[in-house]
């Protein structure tokens, strides 16, 4: 029975592989869109703006999605290692997204454009702040010494819920930004099936598909990482060992 509970569900590897194929395709199509129709990327030129969508797709979509899947993919590895990988992927995603934010604000400043007036920018700042807060709270509960098993168990459902919600919010914000970029450049020509518009629409569909597949994997209760009897909290607060609580699956 123990071997059965620790075995990998038959369909899980295929869904994970499909999610990675979609995620890499999203990044590649984003690069193709920026390269073919927006002139590529550069920091010290008018192409600086293009750093923003590329960084946001890599950080807030692809890497954030992969961070959420860590506990589904690494089912038998030590919980300590899995936690650290989960946290590091979120750190990388945050840093890359921060570069994207700096790029767009710096570009606007150089061009004399207004900041934070569109729905996309409002949603973007909100999701970025929520993402940072989610990481800080998650670090405090699951990696920082001091939190007990019982406290972690009470917070874990909220952490999982808000993690999935922020990811969904990130995908929606990316779609808003994509549409905004197309309308600014193409205007009324967007309705004439311009090649750039068609490619960007395909990118939007790929973003949705990636988000749906990641959330579907997370939603399957029997695909959660099984609890291991030997798993202990990363915290060095030894009094938790006497509280009688045990880790729960994620």
UniProtKB/Swiss-Prot annotation:
UniProt keyword annotations, A-Z: Acetylation, Cytoplasmic vesicle, Electron transport, Heme, Iron, Membrane, Metal-binding, Phosphoprotein, Translocase, Transmembrane, Transmembrane helix, Transport
Membrane-spanning residues: 16-36, 51-71, 84-104, 124-144, 158-178, 198-218
Cofactor note: Binds 2 heme b groups non-covalently.
Domain of life: Eukaryota
Impact noted for substituting residue 108 to A: No effect on protein abundance
GO molecular function list: metal ion binding; transmembrane monodehydroascorbate reductase activity
Annotated L-ascorbate binding sites: 79, 83, 152
Membrane topology, record value: Multi-pass membrane protein
Modified residues (Phosphoserine): 246, 248
Effect of residue 159 to A: No effect on protein abundance. Decreased reduction by ascorbate
Vesicular topological intervals: 37-50, 105-123, 179-197
Annotated positions binding heme b 1: 52, 115-118, 120, 180
Disulfide-bonded cysteines: none
Protein name: Transmembrane ascorbate-dependent reductase CYB561
Biological source species: Mus musculus (Mouse)
Organism taxonomic ancestry: Eukaryota, Metazoa, Chordata, Craniata, Vertebrata
Encoding gene per record: Cyb561
């Amino acid at each position: 029975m123990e071997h059965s509970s620790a075995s990998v569900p038959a369909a899980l590897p295929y869904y994970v592989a499909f999610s990675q194929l979609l995620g890499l395709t999203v990044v590649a199509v984003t690069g193709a869109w920026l390269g073919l129709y927006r002139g590529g990327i550069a920091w010290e030129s008018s192409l600086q703006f293009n750093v923003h969508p590329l960084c946001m797709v890599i950080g807030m979509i692809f890497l954030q999605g992969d961070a959420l899947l860590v506990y589904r993919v690494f089912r038998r590895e030590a919980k300590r290692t899995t936690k650290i990988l989960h946290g590091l992927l979120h750190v990388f995603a945050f840093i890359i997204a921060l570069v994207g934010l700096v790029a767009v604000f710096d570009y606007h400043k150089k061009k004399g454009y207004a900041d934070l007036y569109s729905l996309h920018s409002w949603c973007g700042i909100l999701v970025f702040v929520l993402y940072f807060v989610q990481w800080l709270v998650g670090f405090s509960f699951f990696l920082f010494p001091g939190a007990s098993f019982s406290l972690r168990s009470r917070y874990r459902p909220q952490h999982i819920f808000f993690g999935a919600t922020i990811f969904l919010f990130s995908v929606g914000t990316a779609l808003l930004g994509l549409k905004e970029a197309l309308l600014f450049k193409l205007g009324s020509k967007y309705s004439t099936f311009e090649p750039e518009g068609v490619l960007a629409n395909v990118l939007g569909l790929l973003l949705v598909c990636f988000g749906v597949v990641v959330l579907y994997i997370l939603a399957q209760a029997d695909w959660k990482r099984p609890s291991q009897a030997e798993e202990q909290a990363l915290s060095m607060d030894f009094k938790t060992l006497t509280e009688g609580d045990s880790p729960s699956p994620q």
